[in-house]
Amino acid sequence: PNIILIYADDLGMGMLGCYGQEIVKTPNIDRLAKQGIMFTRCYSSQYCCPARASLLMGVHDSHSRSYTQTNGGLVITAEQQGWSNEELEKKAARAARIKPSGGEVFLPELLKKAGYVTGQFGKLEWGFTTWHGELKRHGWDRYVGYMDHQRAHGYYPSFLWKDGERLPLPGNTHADGGKTPEIYGPGATEKRRGNRDGKVTYAPDAMLAETLKFMEENRNRPMFILFSTNLPHGPVDIPPAENKYAGHPAIRQAYAGAAGGNRECAGAAEEYASMVAKLDRQVGAILAQVHKLGLEKRTIIVFSSDNGHELYYRTDKERGRGLNCHGGVLDGTGELLDVFRGSRGLIGQKNAMVNLAGLKWTNHEGGIRVPLIVSWPGTVPH
């Protein structure tokens, strides 16, 4: 069968309707859950890099030194200093801090040997910087996206990478993708966020288009696709026309009573909700393409996320994360003003909703418990 793995970025399980989300609507992901299996206890890592390495290599992130974690920002520097592709390739390869042993096995490599054509679209590999030679060594026939995960936190890069070449994104002028600070607040940060100069082509749209094209081109071959989108990783950034939750009454009401500068954060929360909804629409586009190509009965679709929930819609992400001397809950959801309760999870025989302790960057439930849905109509029971 074809295998399509949709891998969200920083998406807490509580942000999806099928896992109990009440404000943000995710009908396409909910449909996947309804027609397949929805896991309530799937565990990943506390942040992106080790989670993605485990996914692609099958190694436990704490027990193996065989994967290479590099520093981020190299592609940003390359653009600012005018490096050629060849210069960047050499510098990226030299930047590897943990040298691979040479005996590793990679998921796309195995599937390629089994006759699959392999494609990765989005936030490439595990980061924080990868390069063409590494991607080919791992078994990817086609790739389009960000080689630099630091740059992937900006949604309007001037180019993406496509099979070793730069794929220009029209109208974009920012070497760092137009990234703004990850915490939200009034003043200079908000002014910069509101400046749309050099922000024309939304990178997730370009990566989705390349994914759908790859599916069309390989409809008669077994495909493995890793759609590793950077949605909804912060800082919040969505095309204004797609800010579907602007002025949402439940969000506005929650923030009206917030303390201090957090009263100014309702707009960020609305944009974050719109980013999750955008992710859901992209899942819907992939499902529609599967249907259009007549591939439903021979396509396994897996949906998951790299780690637990993160707060990108308040003025201070860190307050409340520490474990108190009495062993109290880490994230203090009420204090942190998470109107979405993105760290919620299903628990118990009746799947009651609870607030999970911890967020991204912690090894507590809210940081490492992630959504997992598997759908294969006619084969996987629902």
Predicted regions and their residues:
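Short beta-strand segments enriched in small/hydrophobic residues
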Residues: 2-8
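Active-site-proximal cap/lid insertion segments
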Residues: 8-24, 31, 40, 44-47, ...
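Active-site segment of extracytoplasmic enzymes that catalyze sulfate/phosphate-ester chemistry
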Residues: 13-116, 130, 152, 166, ...
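Short, hinge-like loop/turn segments at secondary-structure boundaries
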Residues: 56-61, 136-139, 319-320
